[in-house]
């Protein structure tokens, strides 16, 4: 029987191997093992040799890192369709979809087949989008973008990020927007940029509250401040370099040359620093009006005062030379009155909280919220943080004294929920436009079907991170959606073996 002796257990074979391979084994041990197991001496040697081979093979170092389990993928038509949709969702062009399927799944498909399957899926997505009819219980924001020289009009919920409308239109004039917004007049507020077509459409649809976007004002403002700061630092760097060259020079002529250049650069640096400091003060004054809560009064910003302040700052910039300053001046003067439209709606949200918890307690919590929002939004120096800590602690003590610790946390959650909404613009619609641009840029031809597919996938896919993590826009809007939304497009669920 040799090594095939079935009556010798694995533990016994292991013990035989260890004793035989030991360099300190006693004389006559092989004979003793052969008598113990009733086998020949050669069988003992064979078992030890077999055990040595197993140890050498099992203890050989393998590759480093994790070892994914081997899996056999069953490729069928449904998997190819699913792959085509997912790759399209990721912004892959139709031609590249064919390449990816061939490389990843070893399945060669034609461009015509991909286009045909996507057309069917887009048609089903349009039916699914039509079937979704959530109630509009949030504010909306709108934006327009162009692809293949055609405008696409977009309506997004500011709380859920649900796309209520995404359509290809012949133009983006006021009449077109008015028709699109005609059944959205009951929304809390509508936010947009300062486009004339959008403004005319909002007026035609009789939407009561139209809020202009603060980001369209602040983005170029702080962008110019960053450019002025960069220019000032560049001149200071040249000035430092000229000082170094001056110290290394010994000849009188060269010294005079470096001195003349240094004086010229010093005048430029002084001028650019002064320009930056003056513009930074203007930008900071405009940015202070962006806050929802006035820290001095712990109430909503006084719209009349802020409007007058913005217009006065616009008049200051009007005297500055440069196209960017004229544009900023025009925006400040023309947009100021429409940048605070949100306050009427926000006041309606805060009033019930003041009734429940008391106006002074809610005012203290609003002040705390604004202090923390300012710290998250822009970096502050240590002295500024210490200075902000004093009113934060005073407001907290006041809120505890007025409401008690138990009601404090309930009121704080309500205040954070109320003030945490998107009140001041259409930046969320532009974020969705940024996602859509990835898909449109990869397609030589776009139509309404492409937009319907993007709308469906965006509304039904759950967010991976952020405050909406684990929820899709459709679920946040009150709709029931399966965990695998592609089932709604008549695409079979993924095979369990895959």
Give residue ranges: language-model regions.
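Active-site proximal helix-loop segment of RNase H-like, two-metal nucleases, encompassing DDE(D)
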Residues: 231-247, 251-261, 418, 428-446, ...
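Major-groove recognition helix of helix-turn-helix-like DNA-binding domains
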Residues: 38-54, 107-122
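RNase H-like nuclease fold core
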Residues: 67-96, 100-208, 227, 256-261, ...
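C-terminal domain-tail junction helix/linker
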Residues: 277-280, 284-295, 363-372, 376-387, ...
């Amino acid at each position: 029987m040799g090594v095939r002796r079935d009556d010798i257990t694995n533990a016994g074979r292991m013990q035989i191997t260890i004793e035989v391979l030991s360099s300190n084994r006693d004389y006559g041990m092989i004979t003793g093992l052969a008598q113990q197991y009733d086998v020949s001496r050669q069988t003992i040697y064979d078992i030890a040799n077999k055990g040595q081979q197993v140890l050498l093979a099992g203890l050989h170092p393998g590759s480093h890192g994790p070892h994914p389990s081997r899996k056999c993928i069953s490729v069928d038509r449904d998997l190819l369709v699913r792959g085509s949709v997912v790759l399209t969702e990721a912004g892959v062009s139709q031609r590249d979809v064919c390449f990816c399927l061939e490389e990843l799944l070893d399945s060669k498909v034609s461009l015509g087949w991909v286009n045909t399957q996507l057309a069917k899926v887009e048609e089903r997505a349009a039916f699914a989008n039509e079937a979704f009819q959530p109630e509009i219980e949030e504010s909306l924001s709108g934006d327009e973008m162009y692809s293949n020289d055609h405008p696409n009009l977009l309506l997004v919920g500011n709380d859920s990020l649900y796309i209520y409308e995404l359509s290809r239109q012949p133009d983006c004039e006021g009449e077109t927007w008015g028709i699109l917004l005609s059944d959205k007049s009951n929304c809390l507020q509508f936010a947009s940029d300062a486009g004339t077509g959008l403004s005319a459409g909002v007026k035609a649809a009789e939407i009561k509250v139209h809020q202009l976007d603060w980001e369209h004002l602040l983005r170029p403002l702080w962008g110019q401040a960053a450019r002025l700061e960069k220019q000032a630092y560049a001149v200071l760097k040249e000035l430092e370099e000229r000082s170094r060259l001056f110290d290394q020079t010994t000849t009188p002529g060269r010294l005079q040359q470096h001195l003349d250049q240094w004086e010229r650069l010093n005048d430029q640096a002084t001028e650019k620093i002064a320009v930056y400091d003056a513009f930074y003060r203007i930008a900071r004054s405009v940015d202070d009006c962006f806050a929802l809560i006035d820290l001095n009064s712990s109430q909503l910003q006084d719209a009349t005062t802020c409007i007058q302040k913005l217009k006065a700052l616009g008049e200051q910039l009007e005297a500055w030379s440069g196209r960017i300053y004229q544009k900023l001046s025009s925006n400040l003067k023309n947009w100021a009155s429409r940048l605070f439209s949100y306050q009427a709606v926000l006041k309606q949200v805060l009033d019930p909280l003041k009734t429940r918890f008391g106006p002074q307690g809610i005012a203290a919590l609003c002040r705390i919220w604004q202090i923390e929002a300012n710290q998250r939004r822009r970096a502050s120096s240590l002295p500024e943080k210490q200075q902000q800590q004093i009113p934060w602690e005073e407001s907290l003590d006041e809120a505890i004294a007025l409401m008690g610790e138990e009601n404090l946390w309930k009121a704080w959650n309500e205040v954070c929920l109320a003030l945490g909404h998107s009140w001041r613009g259409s930046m969320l619609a532009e974020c969705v436009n940024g996602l859509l641009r990835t898909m449109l840029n990869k397609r030589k031809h776009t139509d309404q079907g492409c937009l319907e597919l993007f709308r469906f996938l965006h509304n039904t896919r759950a967010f991976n991170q952020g405050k909406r993590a684990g929820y899709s826009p459709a679920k946040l809007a009150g709709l029931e959606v399966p965990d695998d939304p592609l089932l709604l497009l008549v695409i079979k669920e993924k095979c369990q073996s895959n």
